[in-house]
Amino acid sequence: MFFQGEGSIDIPVQDIISWIFDQARYEIEKPVYIDASNTSRSISWRQARTLVRQLAAGLRAAGLKDGDCVCLHSFNDIYYSILVLGIIAAGGIYMGTNPGYTSHELDYHLRVAQAKFVISDPEMLDRMIPAAEGNGIPKDRIWAFTTRESQVIATTGLAHWTALLNHGEADWRRLDDPNHAKTTVVARLFSSGTTGLPKPVDFTHYNIIAQHTLVYDAHPVPFETSRILSLPFFHAAAAPSAHFSALRLGDPSYVLRRFEPDLFLTTVAKHNITECTAVPPIILAILSHCTTPKYSNSLQSLKIVRCGAAPLDKTTQARFQSLLAPDATFTQVWGMTESSCIATMIPYPESDDTGSVGRLLPGMEAKIINTDGDDITAPDTTGEVCLRGPTVVRGYFNLPSANESAFDKDGFYRTGDLGYCDGKTRKWYLLDRKKDIIKVRGFQVAPAEVEGVLRNHPRIRDVAVVGVYDAEAKTEYPRAYVVRQDQSLQEEEVKEFVALRLAKYKRLDGGVRFVDAIPRNASGKILKRLLEDKRDEKL
């Protein structure tokens, strides 16, 4: 017998663009996406629908065919989600990449996702163009995504993304069979998985509609909602709510290009924001800023705050709760890319101060297995949590071996997280992670990727990368254990080698430790558990 989410709710089985645009559920001229730094920039439902139809026509005119993958490489913007919807409307598959990626990382993501087109912020084109060209993407399939059209043409020679709007309008790709909603891919987002390099995860129409239905429709709130969107739009933690739920619900959504504490707090206070989703580093930044009189009451309008992507200790949770109004809730959620984001939550108006990540969403199932993979599902029993349900994806793109190891014969996804379900409250608690993935400020870092880079250093003989926890910053950082080929090699040289090749959050901020040997088993696998004692050293 498996654990099951309480209640049930019908999940629409249709294409996601029709789900959003076939029928308006609110005033169609009402601003939905609003630029937090310049509120005169906004997009309504009517404007969004027209833009999406124009993009569908423009992308098809540019040669996009059904199933082609389009990479969107940018910071947040009110038009970001419009481009996502336009890609899907044209029959394409959206993928997002981190603006901080190097050319090396972009090359990998474009290649593995089999991207055919790119839309990029001009600030990152110096890294994107070499990666795109290396994957056979010509410049006439790369568009610049910015508000400064003339500057783009003059400095890059690339077409501005608005050139895609000059081909009239076309209807979106509608599904001739509703069941195709469960098999047709609309987004290809990356997850580190349990081991190895980031993996492309395929989301269907049904996965995303199910995520919205189980989070929002199953738990309506008794007040008018407004949201602030500050998590990076390329990330699975933000994508479902930012790109799809916003226009379905019609709630005003204030978009930050990236998280900035001052703008965040000013926006919440000025526009009476009622709901936000955050990660622990954002919570810590807000706590720091709210010690000043200027911002001490900035969060009083918030009624729902959810924190996910990494654990948050109960003390920090209580400190943040004290900044909110008495009727506000601050709770933790749990999920992953493979579950289309949220899998467990505590719905409003219930609160929690126990450190729980909540209960399973309606329609979701969970079981617990031991280290041998045996089912040991029972209340208050700790083991690896496995998930099954409408939000759980079908698998990774073009990675059959990864799918075989991550999904069992019954369709359960092995999360790699150790936890248990309280027999009385049905709340879930996560104790540790089975997987080696390092979580840095909510972003996932695959040790194998950093190790792969370091192994290319001419003076490094062997290396292992693990996560070390910084109690002050409330996050993990990568640390490298290095066997030197040359004893003159210094820590800063190793750090710089990684910094030049990987994104900032993958850098060795946990330090470098030089050792005589890396512990391995007979098959050559690194025995990272033997580095546990060293890992506890203070940063």
From Swiss-Prot:
TM region(s), chain numbering: none
GO MF term list: ATP binding; CoA-ligase activity
Protein family membership: Belongs to the ATP-dependent AMP-binding enzyme family.
GO biological process: secondary metabolic process
General function of this protein: Phenylacetyl-CoA ligase; part of the gene cluster that mediates the biosynthesis of nigerpyrone and its derivatives carbonarone A and pestalamide A. The biosynthesis pathway begins with the polyketide assembly by epaA to form phenylacetyl triketide precursor from successive condensation of two malonyl-CoA, presumably with one phenylacetyl-CoA starter unit produced by the phenylacetyl-CoA ligase epaB. For the nigerpyrone biosynthesis, the reactive polyketide chain is released as an aldehyde through the R-domain. A nonenzymatic cyclization and dehydration may create nigerpyrone.
Entry's EC annotation: 6.2.1.-
Pfam family, one: AMP-binding
Record-given protein name: Phenylacetyl-CoA ligase epaB
Ranges where the record places region AMP-binding: 449-525
Keyword line: ATP-binding, Ligase, Nucleotide-binding
Disulfide bonds, paired cysteine numbers: none
Organism domain of life: Eukaryota
Positions annotated to bind AMP: 188-199
Keyword Magnesium: no
Pathway the protein acts in: Secondary metabolite biosynthesis
